[in-house]
Design a protein with these regions (language model features):
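A broad, low-specificity signal for short, low-complexity segments enriched in glycine/proline
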Residues: 1-2, 59
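Active-site glycine-rich loop that binds ribose-phosphate moieties when present
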Residues: 2-28
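Conformational coupling and interaction surfaces
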Residues: 20-24, 37-177
Length: 177
C-alpha cells in the first residue's frame, strides 16, 4: 500500500505516508521492479473507512476480536478526526491485502509513474495518466473500489464468520453514510 494519484496526502498536502518516509525506495521500486507495480493508494483506501457503526456490528459477531481492533485503531480514529474531521479511520493496509487476494475489489488504469525524492513535494507520486512522457507504463493505478465486496471479505475473515451471514447483515445495516 502506498502512494496517491488525485487524492490529497495523509502526511503532507501531496504525499502518502509510506512514500513520504522513503521516497527513494518507492522510486526505485517503480523503476526497477520489472513488472507493473499495482498501486493501492489513497485514492481507493479513502473509500474504506472503519466507523463506530462497523465496530458496533463487529462486536456482536466477535467481541474479542473487535476489542482488539478498537484498541489498535484508536490512534487512527483520533488522527482522522483531528486532521480531516472524519469519525472513523481509513484502513489502508487491509484493502491492499484484500486486493492481493481478490483483484475484483479494485480496478484502475496503467500509466508511467515516478516519485518525487526531494523538495516541497517529497514523496508525491507523479502519474502520467495521459502519456505526456511517452515512457513505458510501469504501474497500474487503482482508482475504483467495490466497498461492499471489501467489507464482505474483510469481515468474514476478521470475525471468523460465515460469508452468507455477513452478506445478509450488510444488506440490512447502514454502516456507511
Amino acid at each position: 500500500m502506498g502512494g496517491n494519484f488525485k487524492s490529497h496526502g495523509n502526511c503532507s498536502p501531496v504525499a502518502e505516508y509510506n512514500y513520504w518516509c522513503d521516497p527513494h525506495a518507492a522510486q526505485i521500486t517503480f523503476e526497477k521492479l520489472g513488472c507493473k507495480l499495482e498501486m493501492v493508494g489513497l485514492d481507493v483506501t479513502r473509500h474504506i473507512v472503519l466507523t463506530p457503526n462497523h465496530l458496533e456490528y463487529m462486536s456482536r459477531i466477535n467481541a474479542e476480536m473487535t476489542a482488539f481492533i478498537t484498541k489498535i485503531t484508536r490512534f487512527y480514529f483520533d488522527f482522522h478526526w483531528e486532521y480531516e474531521h472524519i469519525i472513523g479511520c481509513v484502513i489502508n493496509d487491509p484493502l491492499a491485502l484484500a486486493y492481493f487476494i481478490n483483484s475484483e475489489v479494485c480496478s484502475g488504469f496503467d500509466a508511467y509513474t515516478d516519485v518525487v525524492t526531494d523538495g516541497i513535494a517529497l514523496g508525491q507520486t507523479v502519474v502520467d495518466q495521459y502519456d505526456f512522457y511517452h515512457k513505458a507504463k510501469n504501474s497500474t493505478i487503482l482508482t475504483q473500489v467495490n466497498p461492499s465486496l471489501f467489507w464482505e471479505d474483510f469481515l468474514t475473515v476478521l470475525l471468523d464468520a460465515q460469508k452468507d451471514i455477513i452478506q445478509d447483515d450488510l444488506k440490512n445495516l447502514q454502516l456507511e453514510s
